[in-house]
Every structure is written in structure tokens, then in C-alpha cells.
Amino acid sequence: MKKHTLALGLISALFFSFQAHADLSRTSKGALLGAGVGLLSGNGVNGVLKGAAVGAGVGAVTEKGKDGKKARKGAKVGATLGAVAGVLTGNGLEGAIKGAVIGGAGGAIVGKMN
């Protein structure tokens, strides 16, 4: 129960801080939606944070224009590096898939910011 309360508080803080901005980017919307899905998954704060990261990555990739192009390029590099790291840890195909997802999301966020 304590984890769910903390996670709900984190989601509320994200939601109300984003409401201060009139125009939310796709990255922000993706992070907020991903955090909500992470909360519903029942993994507490860990699920919220992972959901927000993946959601922000997906949102960054779907951005239009120059930012979206940079995010897609970053996602390709991040997914490749993440998949290689996942295989090298000895987790086989499952590690490669998890590494590609997390690496791609992180690469998209970093790529958009550059």
C-alpha cells in the first residue's frame, strides 16, 4: 500500500507540474502516459519510473521536425548499444530485447535534447 501511495503521489506531482505548461510536447505526454501505465502495472515507484522513461522515449521519437529526426537517430544508436549490452550480460535474447527497449528510449530522449 505504501508503494502505491508513493507512486500515486509521484504521478500527481508529474501531472500537476505539466499542467503549468499550456502546450505539452509529445515527449511530456508520453512520459505522463507511460508513468500512468507503470502505476497500473502494480510495480510501484519502479514501474512508474520505467514507464515514464519508455513513454518519454516513444514520445520523443514521434515528435515532428528536427527534434523528431534527432530522436529517431538517437533511438537507433541507443537500441543497438542496449541490445549488445544485453547479450554481453549473458541474458541471451531476452536481455537483448530488454536492452534494446531501454537503450532505444534513452537514446531517443538524449538525441532529442542534442
UniProtKB/Swiss-Prot annotation:
One Pfam entry name: Gly-zipper_OmpA
InterPro entries for this protein: Gly-zipper_OmpA-like_dom, Gly-zipper_YMGG, UPF0757_YmgG
HAMAP family given in the database record: UPF0757
Family in the record: Belongs to the UPF0757 family.
Protein's name in the database: UPF0757 protein YmgG
Gene: ymgG
